[in-house]
């Protein structure tokens, strides 16, 4: 169970870093938002899911 928790935390950190770098790049590029809107929403949905997963796994480990 600890390995699953560690992998989930790593995935959350990696997704956070990708979104922190990627979202401003999408907004700054010309015509970037309209063409990459689905990717940003998918990344945000993945991030929200990982936050809940880490919380659930943390409650099971503690």
Curated annotation (Swiss-Prot):
Record key words, sorted: Chloroplast, Membrane, Photosynthesis, Photosystem II, Plastid, Reaction center, Thylakoid, Transmembrane, Transmembrane helix
Membrane topology: Multi-pass membrane protein
GO cellular component: chloroplast thylakoid membrane; photosystem II reaction center
Cross-referenced Pfam families: Ycf9
GO biological process, one term: photosynthesis
Transmembrane segments: 8-28, 41-61
Cited InterPro entries: PSII_PsbZ, PSII_PsbZ_sf
Subcellular location, principal: plastid
HAMAP family assigned: PSII_PsbZ
Family that this chain belongs to: Belongs to the PsbZ family.
Name of this protein: Photosystem II reaction center protein Z
The species this protein was found in: Piper cenocladum
Name of the gene: psbZ
